[in-house]
């Protein structure tokens, strides 16, 4: 057994590509080695800005010898057929074996492929991996043909056994493999040799390189939070930024700096976004006031002045960036507080195309405002406020701040609406109408915000359905699945009672409401599946009238799911399916529909009479419960049918020799189907 160490050392790899590149290196190497017959015990990939590292433990020293037996042509077959078989097998005639088979004597060839040394296989697999590496973007440099994300300087490829280490010989476009690497670009640039992974990791640490990105993340976060805590502040959590910054440095040195006082009155979100997007700084806030007061930057080296020069340079650049943000903020506020107010931005949206088949943003805003007014009574919102909020909700798209930082849309709308003196409900709707943006995003609950959020998403969906721009497979360029999930969460979280087909018709003339509703049902299945509700239970409820009322549909599905998990539910389902199958076969055979009601005077068996009584007693109760939307009570009525249905099938033969009795019993089965069908279409439930 041997351990393999690979390092591909290059110029700086973009942070966003490092994690994926490490996994690609691991997968391509291990897949290639296993395919060639080299199994292994474990493998892990590590990355820094300048290196991709792969360590494989417990690798076989040789691939195993493989024996393959091939059946050839019959003895006495045409010479050309035999020669073709020999060429394919790489053998001569005297190496073939004749064997008797039921079809006569046949030639057999035994081909033996000897095992190969691990180093030989590794060199082949690594060269193929490097030459065909799936970088999202790559480059060529110098006169070579190799493509890599940044110029590749060296390849470390080392096999380590108990008796020592050996370099796996390899040469790609002038880059030759070896046993050496280099430390930190500035603090320890000299190259040094290594003997294995442990030696490699230890020497890199001494050369100011932290190899593990998770270790770099932990070190950055610990130092940042400690420095902030010492000043009575706290770092704003941002896992995405933390991972990115860890991919920018090999030896993280955390520095905390101050923000000039003239910028402290900017909205905290503006400060945070500007520092993150332009400088990759963490924001440090005062937990009592919520104000951003300082920043954290991460340097890639230690300096004699403990980072003072680095910090001063960063503060200078940051001040220039924040001066721009302050200029945008003050200009936007001046407009918002003027006579024209935020409505003044709407005119320019008439020149902004939303989609070439759906018109401008201004036209879309008019549609959303009209729809929000229609939806308002359903969600308990004031219709005038909902319409007003919808008209100004996207006004900030014309502001300078949102032009610079598109991710602040909505949030800046709230600030500007407040500055313009608009009602707080309107200002809140400006921010919240985009929500929920994802499965973990909070759902708005203020009625005006809910009305505008629903109108915004439904306008998007009905519009793209009207022009036949629907999601296909994995492609969803307009995020319509996310919009549908947003509508579902808004409706369910706020217990909104509305028929979606009616809303679709009001939203956009020409939209296919039935097809769009089916799309919603598919998204609802995905949403409820994560909550433990089976897809067939949802299908059984979708088949019922009023399935475009999602709140009612989910209420029914949850009650049915609970019932189907009970013993009564499982047994009643079997009884229903048996009744439905017998009835369907009889109706097909007889060419009639047995739905005229059974007559008690033709009853012959006590179990039959008991089923009559149970159906009569529970049908009205189930119907009343369904009308009252008390699905738990309806399921209780269904549970009461379980015992008499079981007893009926235990004691009674439906297909009696007496045609009158048979017809009466089939009509009784029809009554079972009818009563159960009030709750859901149980024929769609599996089991």
Swiss-Prot record:
PROSITE patterns: AA_TRNA_LIGASE_II_GLYAB. It comes from the Bacteria. It is an enzyme of class 6 (ligase). It is found in: Cytoplasm. SMART domains: DALR_1 (SM00836). Its EC number is 6.1.1.14. Its main location: cytoplasm. Keywords: Aminoacyl-tRNA synthetase, ATP-binding, Cytoplasm, Ligase, Nucleotide-binding, Protein biosynthesis. The keyword Aminoacyl-tRNA synthetase applies. It catalyses: tRNA(Gly) + glycine + ATP = glycyl-tRNA(Gly) + AMP + diphosphate. GO terms for cellular component: cytosol. GO terms for biological process: arginyl-tRNA aminoacylation; glycyl-tRNA aminoacylation. One of its GO terms (molecular function) is ATP binding. Tetramer of two alpha and two beta subunits. Belongs to the class-II aminoacyl-tRNA synthetase family. This is Glycine--tRNA ligase beta subunit. It comes from Ruegeria sp. (strain TM1040). The lineage of its organism: Bacteria, Pseudomonadati, Pseudomonadota, Alphaproteobacteria, Rhodobacterales.
């Amino acid at each position: 057994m041997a351990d393999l160490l690979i390092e591909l050392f290059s110029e700086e790899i973009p942070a966003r590509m490092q994690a994926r590149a490490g996994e690609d290196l691991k997968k391509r190497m291990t897949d290639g080695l296993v395919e060639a017959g080299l199994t292994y015990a474990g493998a892990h990939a590590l990355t820094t800005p300048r290196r991709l590292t792969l360590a494989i433990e417990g690798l076989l020293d040789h691939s195993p010898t493989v024996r393959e037996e091939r059946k050839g042509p019959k003895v006495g077959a045409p010479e050309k057929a035999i020669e073709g078989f020999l060429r394919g097998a790489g053998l001569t005639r005297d190496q073939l074996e004749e064997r008797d088979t039921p079809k006569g004597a046949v030639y057999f060839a035994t081909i033996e492929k000897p095992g190969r040394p691990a180093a030989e296989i590794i060199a082949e697999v690594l060269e193929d991996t490097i030459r065909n590496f799936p970088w999202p973007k790559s480059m060529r440099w110098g006169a070579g043909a190799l493509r890599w994300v940044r110029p590749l300087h060296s390849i470390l490829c080392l096999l380590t056994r108990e008796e020592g280490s050996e370099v796996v010989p390899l040469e790609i476009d002038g880059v030759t493999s070896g046993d050496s690497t280099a430390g930190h670009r500035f603090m320890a640039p000299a190259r040094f040799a290594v003997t294995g992974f442990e030696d490699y990791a230890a020497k890199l640490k001494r050369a100011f390189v932290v190899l593990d990105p998770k270790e770099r993340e932990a070190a950055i976060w610990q130092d940042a939070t400690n420095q902030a805590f010492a000043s009575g502040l706290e770092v704003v959590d941002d896992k995405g930024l933390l991972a990115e910054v860890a991919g920018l440095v090999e030896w993280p040195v955390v520095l905390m700096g101050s923000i000039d006082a003239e910028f402290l009155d900017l909205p905290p979100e503006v400060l945070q976004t500007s520092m993150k997007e332009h400088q990759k700084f963490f924001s440090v806030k005062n937990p009592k006031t919520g104000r951003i007061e300082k920043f954290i930057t991460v340097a890639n080296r230690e300096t004699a002045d403990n980072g003072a020069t680095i910090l001063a340079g960063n503060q200078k650049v940051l001040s220039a960036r924040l001066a721009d943000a302050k200029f945008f903020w003050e200009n936007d506020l001046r407009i918002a507080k003027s006579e024209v107010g935020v409505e003044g931005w709407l005119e320019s949206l008439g020149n902004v195309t939303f989609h070439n088949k759906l018109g401008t943003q201004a036209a879309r805003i008019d549609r959303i405002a009209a729809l929000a007014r229609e939806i308002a009574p359903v969600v308990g919102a004031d219709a005038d406020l909902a319409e007003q909020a919808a008209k100004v909700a996207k006004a900030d798209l014309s502001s300078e701040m949102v032009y610079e930082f598109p991710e602040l849309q909505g949030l800046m709308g709230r600030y500007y609406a407040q500055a313009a003196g608009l009602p707080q409900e309107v200002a809140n709707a400006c921010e919240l109408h985009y929500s929920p943006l994802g499965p973990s995003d909070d759902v708005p609950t203020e009625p005006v915000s809910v009305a505008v959020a629903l109108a915004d998403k439904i306008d998007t969906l009905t519009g793209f359905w009207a022009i036949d721009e629907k999601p296909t497979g994995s492609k969803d360029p307009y995020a319509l699945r996310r919009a549908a999930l947003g509508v579902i969460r808004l409706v369910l979280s706020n217990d909104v009672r509305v028929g979606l087909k009616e809303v679709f018709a009001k939203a956009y003339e020409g939209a296919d409401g039935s097809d769009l509703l089916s799309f919603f049902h598919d998204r609802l299945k995905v949403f409820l599946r994560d909550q433990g509700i089976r897809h067939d239970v949802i299908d059984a409820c979708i088949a019922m009238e009023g399935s475009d009322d999602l709140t009612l549909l989910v209420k029914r599905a949850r009650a049915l799911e609970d019932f189907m998990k009970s013993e009564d539910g499982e047994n009643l389902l079997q009884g229903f399916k048996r009744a439905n199958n017998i009835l369907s076969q009889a109706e097909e055979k007889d060419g009639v529909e047995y739905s005229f009601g059974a007559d008690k005077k033709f009853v012959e068996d006590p179990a039959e009479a008991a089923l009559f009584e149970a159906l009569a007693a529970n049908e009205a109760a189930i119907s009343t419960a369904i009308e009252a939307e008390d699905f738990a009570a309806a399921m209780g009525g269904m549970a009461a049918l379980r015992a008499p249905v079981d007893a009926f099938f235990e004691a009674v033969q439906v297909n009696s020799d007496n045609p009158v009795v048979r017809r009466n019993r089939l009509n009784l089965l029809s009554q079972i189907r009818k009563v159960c069908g009030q709750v859901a279409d149980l024929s769609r439930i599996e089991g």
